[in-house]
Amino acid sequence: MKKLFVLLTSTLLFACSSGPSLDQLATQMPKDNRSVMLQVPEAGNPVSNGMLVATIRTAGGTSGKRLASLLATDNLHIGIAGNSQSVNKAVAMYGLNNAEKVGKNVSLYLVGDSQSDKADLEKAAKAKNVEMHYIMQK
């Protein structure tokens, strides 16, 4: 019973936690006409978000495919914003792993609080020669 209570409490806290702030991301990005923000929708609850992440990893979804096409543009700063860090990461990973062409001088901005997510994203970005800016959320 105690384990169930701990599990339910942690799930509730996770569900109530706020996602990355769009304002926080916008303040870190360059203020020029070569900056775009990709708004990533989320499913609304942790279970549905988990299913959405699995779908994005395999099929990409609209946001993942849009990111893959944006990565082909030269001199572009791309911010990824949404209420779910796991969905944001899945979109970023799909875009980086499936971009057929990557433009010159492309940078990607993402807000999160996971060191492992940061390492995964930086590794994928480096493989595609994309400058990754992972802003640690406090």
Model feature map: region roles:
Residues 1-4:
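Positively charged n-region of N-terminal signal peptides that target proteins for export
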Residues 12-15:
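C-terminal motif of bacterial Sec signal peptides marking the signal peptidase cleavage site
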Residues 17-20:
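Bacterial signal peptide processing site
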Residues 24-45:
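Post-signal peptide N-terminal segment of mature Sec-exported envelope proteins
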Residues 39-44, 79-86, 108-114, 136-138:
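Structural motif
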Residues 48-107:
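Mature extracytoplasmic domains of secretory-pathway proteins
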Residues 111-138:
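C-terminal partner/receptor-binding element of secreted or periplasmic proteins
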